[in-house]
Amino acid sequence: MEIDTNRKTTLAFKLLAINPSAFGGIIFKGATPEHTESILNFFKISDVNLNKIFSNFSVTDLTGGIDPLESLQKGYLVYRKGILSRPGWFSCTSMNDMPKSLQSMLTYQMDNINLSPIIAFDDGSRKDEVAPPKLCDRLAFSIDLTEVRFNQFSPEFFPITSSKTTKAEITEAQIQSVIVSAIKFGIDEIRPAYMTINAAQYLATLDDRVTVEQKDLNLAATLILAHRALIIPEEIEDDQKDEPQKEN
């Protein structure tokens, strides 16, 4: 199932707004300044703060702690809050330059507190530049803008509401089908399957339905599993067809 970049981005932002803890965030690859400006329009429409996390931040900048400079100036220990305590979403302006200590603390916080969505930018221009894998694993969505002209990138952004969205019902058979699909794609971790199941349930709700249908599963897999795929299922089937059959 293929969907265009604009719709994919719109759906990703809708799902992140509904349940940040289930989906973590989104990665934009190859975004130009013009692309970034379009993305920032979401925050202008929604009146949501975007807190920037820079690669030179310390762990204390993230989580808070003693401010050494102000403590020296005032003569007593001064504590300050970290950026993660602020309301709003978060932006990692350059994932590739983020030191491992900062990556580890950010992923730890994502696993242990209800963190707002993270918008990450993968600006790696060389083949040897790799975005932090542990952080990428926790961000459900990935949008590749490398081949998308800035004047063709116009997602339908929307204001965020505080109303709670319920999840549509999903059957055990549908859950099993998601897990099987993930395995066929060569994905052996449970997190992407969990994200896909949640996405299917919320996509059904957004379509005013109380139960998940196959089209929800297909769309959720396209949004979350496709860019993680290590194996293309069609290739597996072709390989199996080429194998000589055993004689009885």
What does each model-identified segment do?
Residues 140-180, 184-193, 209-210:
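Conserved C-terminal "switch" segment of AAA+ ATPases
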Residues 183-190, 197-212, 223-231:
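AAA+ ATPase "lid" subdomain C-terminal helix
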Residues 1-4, 155-160, 239-248:
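N-terminal charge/polar-biased segments
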Residues 209-248:
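C-terminal engagement/docking regions of AAA+ P-loop ATPases
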Residues 1-149:
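Conserved ASCE/P-loop NTPase catalytic core
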Residues 177, 194-199, 216-219:
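Amphipathic alpha-helical interaction segments
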Residues 2-6, 29-33, 52, 167-172, ...:
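Conserved phosphate/pyrophosphate-binding and hydrolysis machinery centered on Walker-type P-loop NTPases
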